[in-house]
Amino acid sequence: MSEEMNDQMLVRRQKLQELYDLGIDPFGSKFDRSGLSSDLKEEWDQYSKEELVEKEADSHVAIAGRLMTKRGKGKAGFAHVQDLAGQIQIYVRKDQVGDDEFDLWKNADLGDIVGVEGVMFKTNTGELSVKAKKFTLLTKSLRPLPDKFHGLQDIEQRYRQRYLDLITNEDSTRTFINRSKIIQEMRNYLNNKGFLEVETPMMHQIAGGAAARPFVTHHNALDATLYMRIAIELHLKRLIVGGLEKVYEIGRVFRNEGVSTRHNPEFTMIELYEAYADYHDIMDLTESMVRHIANEVLGSAKVQYNGETIDLESAWTRLHIVDAVKEATGVDFYEVKSDEERKALAKEHGIEIKDTMKYGHILNEFFEQKVEETLIQPTFIYGHPTEISPLAKKNPEDPRFTDRFELFIVGREHANRFTELNDPIDQKGRFEAQLVEKAQGNDEAHEMDEDYIEALEYGMPPTGGLGIGIDRLVMLLTDSPSIRDVLLFPYMRQK
């Protein structure tokens, strides 16, 4: 911390003591506002300077917020007060507020939180402003804000001290307001479709529902090992068995994996399940829901991301994974039969694989390494191999593949789901195959879940499901390059 900064902090503490000496509480209590800055502008900005003079008796307002600018000498001055909705100018005159309150104004620092009561007027330049009749200090700020002209330039500091980022960066505030709206519109859409929002456990006895490493914790009283959930899936499908035919949950999921611009150890997902639907129905629902959210939150289903226009309005492409790989590489996995041929093709195309990988794993590696990043416009990739889809129903026409899809936009997976496997015998066999993979070193392979098998044995109707990473969807709809830009408090390494 610089000497200048230390000096500023010292001066602010001296002012704090002066307030106490005057009997003024520098950390005040309630203040009744008549509205936000945007409300005042909407109501009063339509009038001319002269009209506001005529309406002065009816324009009494009360606002509160943080002082962001301050200027003026002598017996009057201007400032901008910032609240959730933006900023509005205030004008403080000694002959209007009195000596004591004007002294408060003179000694106020940028960053202080103030309350102002007054009337609306326009300056000679036409800026709508509040002429103060009463000035109140609500909270004394003991640290100076980042430089007002340059803001918070250090990206890491923005993530570590999000509160400063929100104070100084209007774009960040807008991103998180839109994040809230996106989730709300998701709820509105599903509730209007008859879905029921539910809550299921975050600590599991078995880590299941996804291919991922879990965080492990311990329940002291029960002396039991528990896992932070890596997916919401298996509990929701138990509810389908129980007769709750359309359910969804929006919640946190935890995966013990690396941190990147796309990944955070804890993130937010929505998972939903609909009885008597299949993966075609869920693709339709996904497309419709995302389009609805974009239109409601942004006013358009054509969004800008990283300089490109992403068209969510037009019909989305649907492409089988084998066809996608063939288009990109010329390799037709419908015709590839032996393990030796698959491994030779992988080597020829520079695909890194492990010796234990089978047909489905190698096909998936081709897709992830050669196709995924090229899918800029919304594209459903469907028909994933059985080996990598232990919870998905096999395709009846070709059991090498499943009735599963993933949604890719701007080269990233945004959704994943399938027609759910509801055959308990087949499901148990898939889990057993996953245990073999785990024994061979795949630490993301699925555990056996006997309780879930038992639930399926009571009968689960044909069901379609969906999982969407909300953080990535928010990244797309807010043109944010990193997942840390859409998480209020992303994981950061300890200093």
Swiss-Prot record:
UniProt-listed InterPro entries: Aa-tRNA-synt_II, aa-tRNA-synth_II, aa-tRNA-synth_II/BPL/LPL, Lys-tRNA-ligase_II, Lys-tRNA-ligase_II_bac/euk, Lys-tRNA-ligase_II_N, Lys-tRNA-synth_II_C, NA-bd_OB-fold
Keyword Nucleotide-binding: yes
GO cellular component terms given for this protein: cytosol
Residues that coordinate or bind Mg(2+) 2: 413
Recorded family membership: Belongs to the class-II aminoacyl-tRNA synthetase family.
GO terms classed as biological process: lysyl-tRNA aminoacylation
Reaction(s) catalysed by this chain's protein: tRNA(Lys) + L-lysine + ATP = L-lysyl-tRNA(Lys) + AMP + diphosphate
Annotated NCBIfam families: lysS_bact (TIGR00499), PRK00484.1 (NF001756)
UniProt cofactor note: Binds 3 Mg(2+) ions per subunit.
Pfam family, one: tRNA_anti-codon
Name of the molecule in the record: Lysine--tRNA ligase
Residues given in the record as Mg(2+) 1 binding sites: 406, 413
UniProt KW keywords: Aminoacyl-tRNA synthetase, ATP-binding, Cytoplasm, Ligase, Magnesium, Metal-binding, Nucleotide-binding, Protein biosynthesis
Assembly behavior: Homodimer.
EC assignment: 6.1.1.6
Gene Ontology molecular function, alphabetical: ATP binding; catalytic activity, acting on a protein; lysine-tRNA ligase activity; magnesium ion binding; transferase activity; tRNA binding
Protein's cellular compartments: Cytoplasm
